[in-house]
């Protein structure tokens, strides 16, 4: 049984140079792929007790939400969003963290779907509740201490998925301090896809994006961004390319930039 989930959410300006999270539920209500439910990262799939937005929720919370969406044993899930693709890959990555592998990303998302004049709907699906058996996997989420060790030992490639301007400290939203985690490299999630269709670039082009910054499929790779969203897009592609030791720094710059003792660079 296939479940289709619209994973759209929004990062909105907060008026102070930062961003705030906004659910994409109203966007889903207005139009979605026929048969698609809405997976609400903001209200259902983030740890409300955490200091930073979008943090991985407790296993019980995640399992309850997925069960309510009709996702469980014997189901396959197709994920998409209406913006950058990173909301869909974030939920794909969380499913992976909790041991569910029958999840797929709709290449190009709703943007490409609409470019191709495919049908849209405003009707909610009637997926029956499922039983989601979470089997948490270690090593797919990194924390601050691991990232700090990684930039000191040099054996791990730490990749910033934010824009080039943000990486250099020249513009875009910042998280208290401009720039990047010291000694990290930059593969913007936005550069992984075609600017017209929003479909991913070819496997060869994607592989070159990562190899050009020193990523090695034989070594550990940690992707980060502002709050673990764009980073999941990099992590998704790395996984498709055969990298087997990839993690997302969950709190990312929301945590790192807020701590003045942690090293950062600009330029």
Language-model region placement:
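Cytosolic catalytic domains that perform sulfur/thiol-centered chemistry
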Residues: 1-267
